[in-house]
Amino acid sequence: MAVPAWTPTDPVEKMPNLQPPINWCPAPPKVVSTDVFPYQANEIAISLTEGGHLTPDVVLTGAAASNSLCQFLLIRDFGVNWRHIKALTLHDALLSAQLQRFETDKTLQFMILGYSDSAGPERNNVFLRTGRAKNVFHLLGPSARSRTAVVKPATPNEYFTVNSTVAARAQNRSVVIHPHSPDDAII
């Protein structure tokens, strides 16, 4: 499949009359790097299995995970060069609970950002990041989708951690859902 020649900088999915909130919670810490590390033997093959490299595939991150303020839902360990979500991940209990919360809590709005590891040309990474974000967006129910302000790739060369290990690259092949409550200055 050919990589698109141009990827929009605006939200990938046009959102109906919904402006991005001003007071998003601060994003989880990130690393900006242009370093490229090679895949290890069998790293790609293992990444394409349901088990992948990390357990669990869905985690809460950001402020203290036990605190509902400024939590982010991180869906990680996508297969190398995959945009789709693994079947095992789709049945994750935390993912199911959070999707239900997102659908029923009408005060929440969302920003969804896709990430990739640093391997391969940046143009391909933007394609993967965009596809991952869009696929996670489509997991949301109709109410939560209608309250999503941003669905797009993360900034080029921005990662959750340095890509120097197998686990770090699996962590970076991810999507983060940033919830926001306009009723509060910051959630």
What do the predicted segments below correspond to?
Residues 108-118:
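Short glycine-rich, basic-tinged beta-strand/loop micro-motifs
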Residues 2-110, 166, 180-187:
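Periplasmic peptidoglycan-binding/tethering modules of Gram-negative envelope proteins
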Residues 116-187:
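Periplasmic OmpA-like peptidoglycan-binding domain that tethers envelope proteins to the cell wall
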